UniProtKB/Swiss-Prot annotation:
Name of this protein: sn-glycerol-3-phosphate import ATP-binding protein UgpC 3
Similarity field: Belongs to the ABC transporter superfamily. sn-glycerol-3-phosphate importer (TC 3.A.1.1.3) family.
Localisation per UniProt entry: Cell inner membrane
Pfam families: ABC_tran (PF00005), TOBE_2 (PF08402)
Boundaries of every ABC transporter domain copy: 4-234
Bilayer disposition of the protein: Peripheral membrane protein
Bridged cysteine pairs (disulfide): none
Role according to the record: Part of the ABC transporter complex UgpBAEC involved in sn-glycerol-3-phosphate (G3P) import. Responsible for energy coupling to the transport system.
């Protein structure tokens, strides 16, 4: 196990900056998730940590050692990829043993590590099968097993669940978290899926345009997004972003007090209600556009007042709202997130 320090790391492709100066410390045994949209620099950053990309500026330390010039094999890390990267002509056992054999590990030690990984991942009955005989989830377990047998200082996961269907992704997400907690191995995990990030991470690193927008626990990032980007990216459905003029047009908003510089308010779908709450709220005229039943609750899409501003509410059950019906929507004042659209940052 080890700490990982990323110190003012930059990556340029010619004149194009891909990573624009990242500073991050990963504690021993911590699982950090890099999350953001395609092109934000998260996979590039991971590949620089792994040694698969050169670093333009700055440096990476693993267990206190500057590894900028170290080969990937000499960084004491193990990587799990999206595409499994298994040798098709080898059995599961052969895939698990291959790297250890190449390093000259003794046979008794190889047997011990393979047996331990097989037990942890519950792949013992599959050891003599070829990858083509396995399901996607089983192949990903084998890929993780190949990382485990190395007993590295750190695991690096590069979107390992992207090829799996929705049900299997949920199952493997739980297995990865359970595995990491059992092994207590420092881990960095890359994904574009914010739900995956929220459920796996000790801390999230939200990236955008080659920069870090926010670092924090999943709960802290969700409850207090630092920027308009984070507010719109983290959460499903995402936070509603409403111009202050739309809110102030409501009679009940005349005394609404917000920090100086606020011109945009964020409201989570559960901060908008169709019945008046006991706490302070702003009543808004709304027109129903769409109702999406999603099981035990529904997503209600409405247009506010005479504007073109649409918002999404999370409402219990399957309410009977007709399309184009006029309804009242109540915005909880205590759940408002104040932002400035010029800076993109919070104002409180």
């Amino acid at each position: 196990m080890a700490t990982i320090n990323i110190i003012d790391v930059k990556k340029n492709y010619g004149a194009v900056p891909a990573v624009k100066g990242i500073n991050l410390s990963v504690a021993d045994g911590e699982l950090i998730v890099l999350v953001g949209p395609s092109g934000c620099g998260k996979s590039t950053l991971l590949r620089m940590i792994a040694g698969l990309e050169t670093i333009s500026e700055g440096h990476v330390e693993i267990a206190g050692r500057n590894v900028n010039k170290a080969e990937p094999a000499d960084r004491d890390i193990a990587m799990v990829f999206q595409n499994y990267a298994l040798y098709p002509h080898m059995t599961v056992r052969g895939n698990l043993e291959y790297g250890l054999k190449n390093r000259g590990t003794e046979r008794a030690e190889i047997n011990r590590r393979v047996a331990e990984a097989a037990e942890i991942l519950e792949i013992g009955p599959m050891l003599d099968r070829k990858p083509r005989e396995l399901s996607g989830g089983q192949r990903q377990r084998v890929a993780m097993g190949r990382a485990i047998v190395r007993e590295p200082a750190a695991f690096l996961f590069d979107e390992p669940l992207s090829n799996l269907d929705a049900k299997l992704r949920v199952q493997m997400r739980v297995e990865i978290r359970r595995l990491q907690r059992r092994l207590k191995t420092t881990s960095i995990y890359v994904t574009h899926d914010q739900l995956e990030a929220m459920t796996l991470a000790d801390r999230l690193v939200v990236m955008n345009g080659g920069l870090v927008e926010q670092v924090g626990t999943p709960v802290a990032v969700y409850d207090r997004p630092a920027s308009l980007f984070v507010a719109s990216f983290i959460g499903s459905p995402p936070m509603n972003l409403v111009p202050i003029d739309v809110l102030r047009a409501a009679d009940s908003a005349s005394s609404l007090a917000l920090p100086a510089g606020t011109d945009m308010v964020g409201l989570r779908p559960d901060a908008l209600l169709v019945t008046k709450p006991a706490e302070p709220s702003v009543r808004l005229d709304a027109t129903v556009e769409l109702l999406e039943p999603i099981g035990g609750e529904s997503h209600l899409h409405v247009r506010l007042g005479g504007s073109q501003q649409t918002v999404v509410l999370t409402v219990p059950g399957r309410p009977d709202f007709a399309e184009n019906a006029n309804i009242d929507v109540f915005a909880r004042v205590g759940a408002m997130h104040p932002f400035n659209s010029d800076t993109g940052k919070r104002t409180d």
